[in-house]
Amino acid sequence: MIFLKSVIKVIDNSGAQLAECIKVIRKGSPKSPAMVGDRIVCVIQKAKPLTQNITGTANTNRVKKGDICHAIVVRSKQRNMCRKDGSTVAFGDTACVLINKNTGEPLGTRIMANDGCVDRTLKDKGYNKICSLASRVI
């Protein structure tokens, strides 16, 4: 569960490391927390420094500190979300993947966490591109 001002880990290679949630975009109550598969608006709190290529241009998909981005929650530390078959899954941390605001495509090209796993509910909600980038779908 992600509330406003929650700091979460970014697990793609877009350059961001930590993001702070500033708005939950979902149907229902505006004060309800974000669950796995929900879209959030976040501010990048910590990012890797931009490096220049040999040609002298920076990567276009990179984000920097202070940027406002959209993201999809892919893992949650809370265990209170029950699936249709009655099982529950809890991960060790809460993580998200940055996406394009208009198209919904991921900004990064890889999911780079220690294990690279995401929740299965993303596939049910139509985020097949994120599931294909992940090494495991649990």
Curated annotation (Swiss-Prot):
Keywords: Mitochondrion, Ribonucleoprotein, Ribosomal protein. Pfam families: Ribosomal_L14. This is Large ribosomal subunit protein uL14m. GO terms for cellular component: mitochondrial inner membrane; mitochondrial large ribosomal subunit; mitochondrion. SUPFAM superfamilies: Ribosomal protein L14 (SSF50193). GO terms for biological process: mitochondrial translation. Its main location: mitochondrion. Component of the mitochondrial large ribosomal subunit (mt-LSU). Mature yeast 74S mitochondrial ribosomes consist of a small (37S) and a large (54S) subunit. The 37S small subunit contains a 15S ribosomal RNA (15S mt-rRNA) and 34 different proteins. The 54S large subunit contains a 21S rRNA (21S mt-rRNA) and 46 different proteins. GO terms for molecular function: large ribosomal subunit rRNA binding; structural constituent of ribosome. Component of the mitochondrial ribosome (mitoribosome), a dedicated translation machinery responsible for the synthesis of mitochondrial genome-encoded proteins, including at least some of the essential transmembrane subunits of the mitochondrial respiratory chain. The mitoribosomes are attached to the mitochondrial inner membrane and translation products are cotranslationally integrated into the membrane. InterPro entries: Ribosomal_uL14 (IPR000218), Ribosomal_uL14_bac-type (IPR005745), Ribosomal_uL14_CS (IPR019972), Ribosomal_uL14_sf (IPR036853).
